[in-house]
Amino acid sequence: MADITVVNDTGELYNVINQKKSEGYLESELTIISKSKLHLNDLHDSEISLISTSGTFSDKMTKLLTGEDGEHAVLSRYNLAPDELEKYKQLILDDKMLVVGVRDHSSHQEVLENNSAYEEVDITHFAEASKGPKA
């Protein structure tokens, strides 16, 4: 379930990010959703996802042709109830920002077990003709 916090300005944004980190969220588990692109260099250099609902030029043209709603498209990935979706959509349109925290419960154990880069290398291999190490 997504933990969504509404933020009014960039000063408050940094406080909420620090609060989420103190609650145990990793940067990769945080997303900031805003109406327009945020120009915050320190966030661009982090693992926090920055999503603007206005999108790129091609996104705007697609919305114009298909009638797709950018806010709805971004918020739909969080499986919100229809009334919550409309509430957050309106907040974004009112130039508020949303800080969304979604815990990553996936396990990376399979990678650790099956990736050859993590294997212990056994270097006790000798040439068959030598019959063991030379003394």
From Swiss-Prot:
Pfam families: YflT. Belongs to the UPF0355 family. This is UPF0355 protein MRSA252.
